[in-house]
Amino acid sequence: MSNISNDSGLDDSANSGAVVSANGPLAATRLSWFLAEVDDGLMKDGKPNGRRRLCVLHSMELLESDVSDKYMTRFVEFRVNGMVLEAKLILAADERRLVDAALLSMSKEEREDAGGQQLLVQYTENEKAGERLIQKLVSPNNVMLLSTKPELKGNPLVRLAPGCIAHILYAYESRDYMEKILLHLKARSFDLAFDDNLEAEPEAMNDDTWMLVQYSPEPEMVVYQVVQYRQTVWRKENLFKDVIAYMQLPGSDIVLQAVVISYGQDKEVQDAKYEELQRFSFDIDFPLPEELEKHPDHMTSTALFSRTSLYQKAEQRDTTGEHRELRKSLEQMSEKAQGEAQMIIDAFDMVDNINKNLQSRLSGEVRSVVEVTSGDELH
C-alpha cells in the first residue's frame, strides 16, 4: 500500500466508514472536507510505524457529533477496518477540490517514480454485485503489452493480471500530469451522465431503484457501476440517499462512499448511461500539459465542481426541510465553536497583557530599588 490514503484525492468515495455508533452510522455532522494525517502502521494493521499517511475525510466519517473539538484540538477520530483511529487535521474546506489540490501537492514529494511513464487504462470486471467499469493509472513495468484493436481506434491492449485485459486510453511521462488527466476524465464522465434534476418533488428512492454510481476503492482508480438501492448499506441512516450511497464490496468489510450520478426505476436507462461512459473514454481528447496550465478548468466538472456542491443539491431537493434544518443547526454549531475559539484567544491575549503589565511594573519597582540603593551608597 502507498502512504496515501485509499481516498487519494482522485475520488469522492471517502473510503472506510461513515460516522458510526453502536447502532450504526449517524447523520452528517458538518458539510466539510478535511485533509488529515494518520500513522501509516495504524491504518494498515493497528501497529504504529511512525510513517505519515495523508487522507481525505468528510465530516460524515468522523465519530464525534460535536464539531467544536475539531476547531480547538485539531484531532479527530474515525473508523476504518473495524478500528478507531485518531487523525490530525491539516486543513478543512467546504469544497472537496481544495482539499484534493492540497493532498496532491503535499504527496508529490512522497511518491516514487514521479517522473516515470504512467498509463491510463480502462477495463471491466464482473463481480457478484454486477459488472464494473474501471479506469486507473498503472506503471508500464507492471503490465504486458498485447495488441491493438482497429475497431477501437488503435487503443493498445495490455494484460494487468491473468484474465484481466485493459485498453490503454492515454500515456505520458509524468505522474502528476496523469493524475490530473484521470481527474479530467472523471469530471467529463460525471458531466455526461449526471442527472441535474432539481424538481420540487423528485422521484422517491426505494429498494427497487437502480443507481449509476461512481467510487474509488483504491488510489488512482475510478469505478462506475449500476447497482440496485437494496444492494447498498446504511440506507436508513443515509440522509442524502439521492446523492451518496454506502457500498460494501463482496468479500470486504470496508464500506465505500459512492456518488450517485443518476437513478430511476428503469435499469435499462442506467445501463445505457453506463455503456455510454464506457464508449466515451475512447472518444475524448485529453488536454496537453501546457493546456492544463493555461486552462485549469479542463480538470474541473461543470456538474461536480462548478455548480453548488452535491450536498447543497440534496438540500435543494429536500421537500421535508430535514436537510435545511440540519445545515442550519450545523452552521449554528460552527458559529458557536468559532465564537468559543475567539473567546479563548481573547482570554489568552488578556492573560498575556496582564503578564506584560506585571513584568513592566516589577521592572519599574526593581529600577526604583536600585536607584534608591545607589543613592544611599553615595552618601
From Swiss-Prot:
It is found in: Nucleus. The keyword Protein transport does not apply. Its main location: nucleus. Keywords: Nucleus. One of its GO terms (molecular function) is protein-macromolecule adaptor activity. GO terms for cellular component: chromatin silencing complex; nucleus. It comes from Drosophila melanogaster (Fruit fly). This is Early boundary activity protein 3. The heterotrimeric Elba complex is required for chromatin domain boundary function during early embryogenesis. It binds to a 8-bp sequence 5'-CCAATAAG-3' in the Fab-7 insulator or boundary element in the bithorax complex and contributes to its insulator or boundary activity. Elba3 lacks DNA-binding activity and plays the role of an adapter protein, bringing Elba1 and 2 together, thereby establishing a complex that recognizes the asymmetric sequence motif through the BEN domains of Elba1 and 2. The gene is Elba3. Signal peptide: none annotated. The heterotrimeric Elba complex consists of Elba1, Elba2 and Elba3. One of its GO terms (biological process) is heterochromatin boundary formation. It comes from the Eukaryota. Transmembrane segments: none annotated.
